[in-house]
């Protein structure tokens, strides 16, 4: 007899991120549902279980977060496109007659652990189907775990048993929580012991059976490891508790409840037809499939000849699809004239082709530049990038992987791509480009692609290649200072509290604040008192311990997020960090940055800003920082055509003081700093569709006062109100909004019946044309500055772009001409009804330029 338990959340998440973006003709997202159903069917057919269940997380105050508020804090919220698919998954499971088991406040792993614990001694063979390795701790003589991953509609599995887990994972099943207690788990934000890596942890658990035994034998462990263990003891045991699956939830489930039952084929058929899952309907033999029409898939991939490319003269076509194959470290080119796929690893030959008059159609051109390690891109021409073209058409896609683009734009059969991915992909590139070009023309996006996004590619490539120098010694010193401040704060907090406690534990902190120190309770959760940032800010002046706790949280974030991450990112050869600028990473058109993310370097608090001191130029160079002044408000003035706003910017009036004067009904000379501060919050808040609640919270006034403030603002700036209302209406009528340069952002939930979702969508609609236009202007400016630096044969390089700020590393003797160039080109990037103003500063580190 066999029981199969599916980890619903894990399988669903992995299907969503692994599969291309799929939607029905009614725009229902379906990729996660499709992948999930295929996994369920595969293992129902393969395992033929007598009993079956699907475990899901269930919202509620999470038990682990009650102990450690940062647990999974690094996880992004569930994407909207995944959220809307969950009800369909549940409907399908009901139609399959598969029980859904969940328990409020606990994760699917805990439900699985409790089911295993309840039934493992009943003689059953138990198979756990999941996408992650957390459940390996549940392995037993009759319990196996199959780790599955989805690629298109193919499911790949990795089988773990109690016998092979040590060989494959490095520790025994019952040591998995101990292992995570030592090394941590980045995906769940489990801290572990600082400085203990995988090999050290495995060695320790080879010698000692558990975390407890390790700490009982500290005197036998070499000093370098022992010191780390001693310093991280509290975090180690906290991490073990977080990593240990709960196996005693009172699920109130009987084995008979899980018995495999007949499917409700009629209901199953209805749902699958609604989701347009033709292949699954056919696979299940559901009878009425012939009544429904589906779009014909394009599978007409020609048989092609394959040859080694030896000379550019072999190419006859005027347009050549060209792609880099990572696994083989070589390039594939398709010549339609001779119906030949040419293959080469000769980088000089590829560089020659990129410089030729032939039109090259590629995917991810910037990556190809990196593979060729080009010194410069001056003579590269006639290159098209389908990834960037697809981003221009839809900046809200969840994936820009090549296969997903084939499916979305060519309706290509997934199987056709899979049969010979490299050959099929390079052959289809030309078709894909033709379709994208047609849509770009249809949507009037030519300027956005040809003058902004495509010419930005070489700019970003050279920025990534150049990198940003980091003073490693200064960073290490700064890290030590932060660590010392944390230790000092801990000591002060414990002295005031009169006892040691885990400051990171909301439960223990709430006991100290609200029970021991008797501070007023601001907010409660299901499991106790809230200690979130909003609560602590309200308690700031109520007790001396509260500011210390806020400082402690600030410094620990600086340490873990910035100091430690940055140290690891320094290239040992160049002494610089080489971030990746992601051109397709945001819905607004802004650039994103990763590995490391240099766009989230702190700007909000003084101590965090100090980390900018470690970013320095090379010797004999200086950093030049150019920052647009109030660009989003200037764009708002331009788009709304509000006369008062336009007049203020044209006459170089302090816009925040003018707004304060208008709203408070005083002369501009009589505006107090407090009035200006409140007006500033309104000015910037309006751009983001701020509500009276949000404004009241931000400037600490009553909600009624905030509403009056906003109403007065709109009375004085009526065309701003008119613009915002018209923009929301346009979004509701069309499903998208546009920037000044025709960048389109689709707005989900703009017609939602859920008030919160609709309100959020309306705020996005208000802000996106403004923020997106600012991003487009910055990109135009970057291109112009880059070109002028080249034209003047200057050695200066653009090294970073963060929101409204551009940073250039210039030899000292070039700094004056560079400052002139950057100010002129940025201020004249585009002509608006108001002037663009750029503030230019210089310094010997990034901090000095601000």
From Swiss-Prot:
Domain (5'-3' exonuclease): residue spans on this chain: 1-288
Classification via InterPro entries: 3'-5'_exonuclease_dom (IPR002562), 5-3_exonucl_a-hlix_arch_N (IPR020046), 5-3_exonuclease (IPR002421), 5-3_exonuclease_C_sf (IPR036279), DNA-dir_DNA_pol_A_CS (IPR019760), DNA-dir_DNA_pol_A_palm_dom (IPR001098), DNA/RNA_pol_sf (IPR043502), DNA_polI_H3TH (IPR020045)
EC number(s) per entry: 2.7.7.7
Enzyme class: transferase
Pfam families: 5_3_exonuc, 5_3_exonuc_N, DNA_pol_A
MF (Gene Ontology): 3'-5' exonuclease activity; 5'-3' exonuclease activity; DNA binding; DNA-directed DNA polymerase activity
Keyword Thylakoid: no
Keyword Acyltransferase: no
Keywords: DNA damage, DNA repair, DNA replication, DNA-binding, DNA-directed DNA polymerase, Exonuclease, Hydrolase, Nuclease, Nucleotidyltransferase, Transferase
Biological process terms in GO annotation: DNA-templated DNA replication; double-strand break repair
Domain of life: Bacteria
Reaction(s) this enzyme catalyzes, per UniProt: DNA(n) + a 2'-deoxyribonucleoside 5'-triphosphate = DNA(n+1) + diphosphate
Region (Polymerase): 470-850
Family designation: Belongs to the DNA polymerase type-A family.
Functional note: In addition to polymerase activity, this DNA polymerase exhibits 3'-5' and 5'-3' exonuclease activity.
Name of the protein: DNA polymerase I
Organism of origin: Caldicellulosiruptor bescii (strain ATCC BAA-1888 / DSM 6725 / KCTC 15123 / Z-1320)
Gene transcribed to yield this protein: polA
